[in-house]
Design a protein with these regions (language model features):
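Short conserved active-site loop signatures built around small residues
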Residues: 1-32, 223
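Short hydrophobic/aromatic beta-strand micro-patches
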Residues: 224, 346-348, 408-410
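Active-site beta-loop-alpha junctions enriched in small/polar residues
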Residues: 158, 187-189, 324, 350, ...
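Conserved small-domain helix->loop->beta segment predominantly found in fold-type I
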Residues: 273-276, 280-282, 287, 291, ...
């Protein structure tokens, strides 16, 4: 199948299984619930382990259900290869660990998911990898923060929880000038609304648990290799360019070519630490992927109507959504998201924690839980939950106030959502 000639809505249904299953003629992708695979002979086994034959070796590394999912997400993002793992957190961790060692450094936007902030601020430093967090509103901050030992710049297409937007092309240019890759989390953006690789990003990560799965039922993460970054020419990434002593002495840039980055994660990090996605979860996430465009269109449509409702409500102090003309990222929103975006955003209730929690506790349709991007509408109070590990200064720097509430707008009928929001606000 010549995927470049097909539209997104077709690719999300067919890539990876262009023909029915060869063993059963099944149209749906089968769940290959197996741990291991039979080699034809000793030479065949050696070729698989030596990466001369790209087939399955062991269930911790590859699975045919997983393979279809990986190929499909990679095609939708415009990348050369994908790797599915057990969670979005695992995807981010592997993406950064793959090209860093003790003594290395990362530059990250500070307006990111609290779990990723914690990884960069507390967990990775225990392994000798430090991070400088910068205010992405001033692009010069990225340039100033890059050091000789910096190995990556990390951002999100839409920040969590406030859906701030960063000039991807400008940050990519800065990173490439210093011969380092731009890694971007496109969980909130989705490849339907934006394909960061087309704007200069080198590696894309997702929590597939969110919009890709879409129904809050299965954990999963994906790493997509853009295939354009020249790891050898950079001279900063011996992990990919020199003989690997724990994998037959191969050079990943030679053995895997444009897919060297994700191939090393699969061959080394996934092999040794095992954050493997289950075949069943890969199947469930594939099911979600097939309706991604339809769901995201409805998410965005509903979100814009909720924003319009909230900005006029007397008990709302502020709405943080880039579609609003007064939002500081509105121009970037129009540039990078011509079809709209940000069904996950925050607003500020007048008062503080007490008022915000009163509003949340009186919602009837919105579910209070630690997830987003479900077809069901969700709500949470970031300061006391998802970002509770941050101190007051860090919360302020990320734009999270005592009265901040995060909404994830689902696909219910918009009239029902507006009625629910109105009655809960009336309880304050």
């Amino acid at each position: 199948m010549e995927t470049k000639k097909l539209h997104f809505e077709t690719l999300q249904l067919h890539v990876g299984q262009e023909q029915p299953d060869p063993a059963t003629d099944a149209r749906a992708v089968p769940i290959y619930q197996t741990t291991s695979y039979v080699f034809r002979n000793s030479a065949h086994a050696a070729a698989r382990f030596g990466l001369q034959d790209p087939g399955n070796i062991y269930g911790r590394l590859t699975n045919s259900t997983q393979g279809v999912f990986e190929a499909r997400v990679a095609a939708l993002e415009g990348g050369v290869a994908g790797l599915a793992v057990a969670s979005g957190a695992a995807a981010v961790t592997y993406a950064l660990e793959n090209i860093t060692r003790a003594g290395d450094h990362i530059v990250s936007a500070k307006t990111i998911y609290g779990g990723t902030y914690n990884l960069l601020e507390h967990t990775l430093p225990a392994y000798g990898v430090t991070t400088t967090f910068v205010d992405p509103a001033d692009l010069s901050n990225f340039e100033k923060a890059i050091q000789e030992n910096t190995k990556a710049v990390y951002i999100e297409t839409l920040g969590n929880p406030n859906s701030n937007i960063i000039d991807i092309e400008a940050v990519a240019e800065i990173a490439h000038r210093h011969k380092i890759p731009l890694i971007i989390d496109n969980t909130f953006g989705t490849p339907y609304l934006i394909r960061p690789i087309e704007h200069g990003a080198d590696i894309v990560v997702h929590s597939a648990t969110k919009f890709i799965g879409g129904h809050g039922s299965s954990l999963g993460g994906v790493i997509v290799d853009g295939g354009k970054f020249d790891w050898a020419a950079s001279g900063k990434f011996p992990q990919l360019t020199v003989p690997e002593p724990c994998y037959h002495g191969i050079r990943f840039t030679e053995a895997a070519g444009a897919a060297a980055y994700v191939t090393r994660i699969r061959a080394i990090l996934l092999r040794d630490t095992g954050a493997t996605i289950s075949p069943f979860n890969a199947f469930i996430l594939l099911q979600g992927l097939e309706t991604l465009s339809l769901r995201v269109e409805r998410h965005v449509e509903n979100a814009l109507k909720v924003v319009d409702f909230l900005k006029k409500h007397p008990k709302v102090a502020a709405v943080n959504h880039p579609s609003l003309t007064e939002h500081p990222d509105h121009a970037l929103y129009q540039r990078y998201f011509p079809n709209g975006a940000s069904s996950i955003f925050t607003f500020e209730v007048k008062g503080g924690v007490k008022e915000a929690q009163t509003f949340i506790d009186n919602l009837q349709i919105f579910s209070l839980l630690a997830n987003v991007a479900d077809v069901k509408s969700l709500v949470i109070h970031p300061a006391t939950t998802t970002h509770s590990q941050l101190n007051e200064q860090e919360l302020e720097e990320q734009g999270i106030k005592p009265g901040t509430v995060r909404l994830s707008i689902g696909t219910e009928h918009i009239a029902d959502l507006l009625d629910d929001l109105a009655q809960a606000l009336d309880k304050i």
